[in-house]
């Protein structure tokens, strides 16, 4: 208990209980700030159309500007599929005789709106591409998280943070029509668990 310094908020309840107790202070100390990079991975699926994708783009813009002022590098990524209801992946599966349990049957589209080494001012217009008509299709979250994580782990920064902005579970009609109904969700959970254990 010091007489001056930074207010010790952990001791405030005792002042509320007994207002005659004196305020408690603690000594300020400068901590070394770890070199940090943040990756924002944004769901660019059709269910995000309208207000949700607008809010996600605004959040990415605000977070990027704010964190860069604190010397934190920010990467902004997006994920969707190239097609509705399959694409070359599904065509290939059809040509090969429609094998059982084929796995993913859509082509991925992973987008780099802003790389970590690019300043916000140079890439702010890219965020508007999220609002482009026809971009938002389906979402295969597990593979997108793996992609973002692999990009992040190549970075030299000491502290690495991956944030995902999404409105729900992964959905790809082409994949789910021939695999189990929870195929993509199970893969997502396995992916997250695997990354958390590294």
Regions picked out by a protein language model, each given a short descriptive name:
Residues 1-198:
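Acidic, glycine-rich A-domain
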């Amino acid at each position: 208990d010091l007489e001056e310094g930074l207010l010790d908020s952990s001791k405030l309840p005792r002042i509320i209980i007994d207002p005659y107790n004196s305020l408690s202070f603690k000594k300020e100390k400068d901590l070394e700030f770890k070199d940090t990079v943040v990756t924002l991975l944004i769901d660019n699926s059709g269910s995000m159309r309208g207000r949700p994708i607008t809010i996600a783009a605004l959040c990415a813009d605000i977070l990027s500007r704010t964190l860069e002022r604190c010397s934190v590098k920010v990467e902004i990524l997006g994920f969707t599929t190239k097609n509705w209801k399959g694409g070359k992946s599904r065509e290939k599966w059809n040509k090969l005789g429609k094998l059982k349990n084929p796995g993913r049957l859509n082509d991925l589209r992973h987008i780099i709106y802003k790389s970590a080494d690019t300043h916000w001012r140079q890439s702010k217009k890219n965020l508007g591409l999220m609002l482009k008509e026809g971009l938002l299709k389906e979402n295969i979250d597990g593979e997108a998280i793996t992609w973002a994580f692999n990009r992040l782990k190549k970075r030299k920064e000491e502290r690495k943070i991956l944030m995902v902005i999404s409105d729900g579970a992964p959905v790809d009609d082409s994949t789910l029509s021939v695999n189990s109904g929870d195929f993509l969700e199970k893969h997502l959970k396995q992916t997250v668990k695997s990354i958390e254990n590294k």
